[in-house]
C-alpha cells in the first residue's frame, strides 16, 4: 500500500542552533510525521555544533528525525545516532569513499542509512544496498517514474512546499 508522510526539512547550515530547535518544535506541533535536519559542512567544528543542535532537537520533539551530515569517518555516523536521530542521510555526491558508506550500511542496517541524490542522475544504477533514496529537485515526468520503478527502493522526494 502506498502512503504519504509530511517530513519537513530544516537546513542547519549557517543557522543558529536556537532557530533550528524552534523551527523543529513548530513543525512537530503543526503535525509533521517526521523531520529531516541537515548540515553538510565539511568543517569539523561546524559538524560538532550541529550534533549538539540535534541533541537539543531530540529533547524537544516527540517525532522521529533524520539527520543529514557530511561523513568523513565511521565515528561520525555513530555520533549522529547518539543524538537520537532515527536515520542518517548521506549526500551521495559528497561520498569520497563508498567503503565507508558500505560499512555504515553493514553496521546499522540498510533501513537506517538513506542516500540523498539529485533527480537528474541515474540513481537506479547506484550499486548500494540501501532501502531508501532521498531525491531532491524533482520534476516528475515519465523518465523519473521509470527510474523510481527500476530502483526498486523507497523514494522520499525532498521538495519545498512553497
Regions found by a protein language model. Give the residues of each.
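Extended substrate/RNA-proximal surfaces in nucleic-acid metabolism proteins
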Residues: 104-105
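Conserved N-terminal beta1-alpha1 strand-loop-helix module at the mouth
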Residues: 1-65, 71-75, 79, 113-115, ...
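Glycine-rich phosphate-binding active-site loops on the catalytic face of alpha/beta enzymes
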Residues: 40-42, 79-100, 132-144, 154-162
